[in-house]
């Protein structure tokens, strides 16, 4: 390390050892300004007698200071040297030689031998492409496959073949379903037909795919060309159709249903098959009723009683309390179980326990079940969701998604980013089994845009109430749907709830009567 006190030497050292030029030239201007200032300062500090000597030395020093170094250049390309003319000429010659290699010179020579016109014509013979023999040539694989599968061309359900998922396994979400075919003979009906469909297909598309595969496999009997003539029902593993539930909605996607076994059933909508239309028998019981589906009126009352007892949870024919059937219009008159439904001239009966009576009732006129009401009752078991507001104790509301099906009621909170939940308790999802539901009542209806209903259910041996609000149309639909589900299920919790409610009402009436008697 060196210590210098002479600014002139420092400036000279910077010029000789460093690059002081840039694109703007500002660095050189700064150094030159310092040189001028130092020169004036040095001349003013020197006595007059030595002025001549210092002028001579200053001239040498000034020349030394302003002398440019070899390393100082005017730009950053000081390390690049221009190519000489010889190098450029050699590069041009090299490119010309490469271009000459790509060219081929052909020397033209006159022919020594003479050829006739026929020989010359055979060299470039004209061919007629219009006259082509169609019998010659190899047959394509597509033509061979079309000849081997003549039914593929005549299949009326070809438009549904695009929903076949056998060629999409591993690449697209698919669903494998075993389908029982009710229209086949008794032996073929026992074996299901395996169908692989893409997951985003609808139920209507799956029905068309089943018909397409049925026709492709040349099964008998032949199907109706109309896909709307069929429907899909839930089936057991042994192929028995579960008639307790309605058919799957044709507009819903198939991935919404988690059933791996279904049954293809014909709707019997044509006038010629009206005799095969299913009938519904209403069986009234305590705090509810059941709808029994029968194929014809030739079924015995014993079979209807067994189906009605099977509907009741925990009730068996050979164990527990015994039951009998009575006509709704004829109380305390048991029905002959060996007789047929046709001989009863009624479709509404009452299920009564043995050695008991349902009381003296006034004979009622025989009521015919409305088919539209039956369809509403059956469709009530299908899943449907509603967006409502749940009312809490502090009267604040929470938006929830209310999902209702024949098995359970689900309450899922709807997350809203705009609503702050800092001061409120976060709503948790709630799932209520249908056997634990007790009641669903309309609590308040102020206007068509605002109504409130109450849901009562059993939880840990205690009855709890949930309040919801929405527009009047939605509330009425929810109340009607839940009540249809409650009436079609003989729930023990619902029966106990009404019994407890009746006891409270009786106790309240008795208390008020005694109070009036004392005051009187």
UniProtKB/Swiss-Prot annotation:
Family per similarity comment: Belongs to the SIN1 family.
Membrane topology term: Peripheral membrane protein
Activity modulation comment: Phosphatidylinositol 3,4,5-trisphosphate (PI(3,4,5)P3) promotes MTOR activation by relieving MAPKAP1/SIN1-mediated inhibition of MTOR that takes place in absence of PI(3,4,5)P3.
Organismal lineage: Eukaryota, Metazoa, Chordata, Craniata, Vertebrata
Subunit structure: Component of the mechanistic target of rapamycin complex 2 (mTORC2), consisting in two heterotretramers composed of MTOR, MLST8, RICTOR and MAPKAP1/SIN1. Contrary to mTORC1, mTORC2 does not bind to and is not sensitive to FKBP12-rapamycin.
One GO CC term, this protein: early endosome
Function of the molecule: Component of the mechanistic target of rapamycin complex 2 (mTORC2), which transduces signals from growth factors to pathways involved in proliferation, cytoskeletal organization, lipogenesis and anabolic output. In response to growth factors, mTORC2 phosphorylates and activates AGC protein kinase family members, including AKT (AKT1, AKT2 and AKT3), PKC (PRKCA, PRKCB and PRKCE) and SGK1. In contrast to mTORC1, mTORC2 is nutrient-insensitive.
Organism expressing this protein natively: Xenopus laevis (African clawed frog)
Protein's name in the database: Target of rapamycin complex 2 subunit MAPKAP1
Taxonomic superkingdom: Eukaryota
Annotated ranges, domain SIN1-type PH: 382-487
One Pfam family, short name: CRIM
Region (Disordered): 310-333
């Amino acid at each position: 390390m060196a210590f210098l006190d002479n600014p002139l030497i420092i400036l000279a050292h910077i010029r000789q050892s460093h690059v002081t030029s840039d694109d703007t030239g500002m660095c050189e201007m700064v150094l030159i300004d310092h040189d001028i200032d130092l020169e004036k300062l040095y001349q003013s500090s020197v006595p007059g007698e030595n002025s001549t000597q210092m002028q001579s030395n200053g001239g040498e020093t000034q020349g030394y200071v302003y002398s440019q170094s070899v390393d100082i250049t005017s730009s950053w390309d000081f390390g690049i040297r221009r190519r000489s003319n010889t190098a450029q000429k050699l590069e041009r010659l090299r490119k010309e030689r490469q271009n000459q290699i790509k060219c081929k010179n052909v020397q033209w020579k006159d022919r020594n031998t003479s050829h006739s016109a026929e020989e010359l014509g055979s060299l470039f013979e004209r061919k007629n492409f219009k006259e082509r023999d169609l019998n010659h040539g190899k047959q394509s694989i597509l033509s061979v496959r079309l000849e081997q599968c003549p039914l593929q061309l005549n299949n009326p359900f070809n438009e549904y073949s695009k929903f076949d998922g056998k060629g999409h396994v591993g690449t697209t979400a698919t669903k494998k379903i075993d389908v029982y075919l009710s229209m086949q003979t008794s032996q073929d009906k026992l074996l299901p037909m395996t169908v692989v469909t893409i997951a985003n297909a609808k139920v209507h598309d799956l029905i068309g795919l089943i018909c397409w595969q049925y026709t492709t496999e040349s099964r008998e009997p032949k199907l109706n060309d109309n896909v709307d003539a069929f429907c899909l029902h839930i089936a057991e593993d042994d192929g028995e159709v579960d008639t307790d539930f309605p058919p799957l909605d044709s507009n819903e996607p198939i991935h919404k249903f988690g059933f791996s076994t279904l049954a293809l059933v014909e709707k019997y909508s044509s006038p010629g098959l009206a005799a095969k239309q299913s009938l519904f028998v209403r069986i009234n019981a305590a705090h509810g009723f059941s709808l029994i589906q029968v194929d014809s009126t030739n079924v015995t009352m014993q079979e209807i009683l067994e189906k009605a007892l099977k509907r009741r949870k925990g009730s068996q024919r050979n164990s527990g309390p015994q039951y009998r059937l009575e006509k709704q219009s004829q109380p305390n008159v048991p029905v002959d179980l060996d007789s047929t439904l046709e001989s009863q001239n009624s479709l509404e009966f009452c299920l009564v326990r043995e050695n008991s009576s349902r009381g003296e009732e006034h004979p009622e006129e025989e009521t015919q079940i409305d088919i539209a009401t039956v369809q509403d009752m059956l469709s009530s078991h299908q899943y449907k969701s509603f967006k409502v507001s749940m009312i809490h104790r502090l009267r604040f509301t929470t938006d929830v998604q209310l999902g209702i099906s024949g098995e359970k009621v689900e309450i899922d909170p709807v997350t809203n980013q705009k609503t702050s939940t800092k001061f409120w308790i976060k709503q948790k999802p709630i799932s209520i089994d249908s056997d634990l539901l007790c009641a669903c009542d309309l609590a308040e209806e102020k206007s068509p845009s605002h109504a409130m209903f109450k849901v009562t259910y059993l939880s840990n041996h205690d009855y709890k109430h949930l309040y919801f609000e929405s527009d009047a149309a939605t509330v009425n639909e929810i109340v009607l749907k839940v009540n249809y589900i409650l009436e079609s299920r003989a729930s023990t919790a619902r029966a106990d709830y009404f019994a407890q409610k009746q006891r409270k009402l009786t106790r309240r009436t008795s208390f008020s009567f005694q109070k009036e008697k004392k005051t009187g």
